[in-house]
From Swiss-Prot:
Part of the ribosomal stalk of the 50S ribosomal subunit. The N-terminus interacts with L11 and the large rRNA to form the base of the stalk. The C-terminus forms an elongated spine to which L12 dimers bind in a sequential fashion forming a multimeric L10(L12)X complex. NCBIfam families: PRK00099.1-1. Keywords: Ribonucleoprotein, Ribosomal protein, RNA-binding, rRNA-binding. It comes from the Bacteria. GO terms for molecular function: large ribosomal subunit rRNA binding. GO terms for cellular component: ribonucleoprotein complex; ribosome. InterPro entries: Ribosomal_uL10, Ribosomal_uL10-like_sf, Ribosomal_uL10_bac, Ribosomal_uL10_bac_type. GO terms for biological process: translation. The gene is rplJ. Forms part of the ribosomal stalk, playing a central role in the interaction of the ribosome with GTP-bound translation factors. The keyword Ribonucleoprotein applies. This is Large ribosomal subunit protein uL10. The keyword Lipoprotein does not apply.
Length: 165
């Protein structure tokens, strides 16, 4: 059923609001994907707080006008699904991971930090660890010297007790 003018304006406003908060936008061609697979992709996107939507390209172009994602408008051709996220890598990671298991989802382009990326750029962005993973690695690196020192003190205390006994 075609959208009337008010519905189109509402869609553009909704997508523009998402784009205004976003750090990353990823475009992927979804030709030939089964409905069940698309539902799975949407569920994974929801878990990662990624706004994922199939849009008419003209409406998407209007939504990105005047934003840092405006250069992506040139890439908006064909049947596309749009992944939009506030997290810098979440949209790229969700779409890239799904495209590995389903060859019918083809990453077309993306934009991060005002720069348009091709498929390789989106895949490179997706390979970056998440903020939580980076924080846990940093914490481990910071704890390693302290825990090593604590183990050395414990070993020294055991040695002293063994000598005293």
């Amino acid at each position: 059923m075609p959208l009337n003018r008010e519905d189109k304006q509402a869609v553009v406003a909704e997508v523009a609001a998402q784009v205004a908060k976003a750090q990353t936008v990823v475009l992927a061609e979804y030709r030939g994907i089964a409905v069940g697979d698309l539902t799975t992709l949407r569920a994974k996107a929801r878990e990662q707080k990624v706004y994922l939507r199939v849009l008419k390209n003209t409406l998407a172009r209007r939504a990105v006008e005047g934003t840092p994602f405006a250069p992506l408008a040139e890439q908006m051709t064909g049947p596309l699904i749009y992944g939009i996220s506030e997290d810098a890598i979440a949209a790229a990671k969700v779409v890239n991971d799904f495209s590995k298991s389903n060859d019918k989802l083809v990453i077309k382009a993306g934009s991060f930090d005002g720069k348009v990326m091709d498929k390789a750029g989106v895949q490179a962005l997706a390979s970056i660890p998440s903020r939580e993973e980076l924080l846990s690695k940093l914490l481990f690196v910071m704890q390693a010297p302290v825990s090593g020192f604590a183990r050395a003190l414990a070993a020294l205390a055991e040695k002293k007790q063994a000598e005293a006994a």
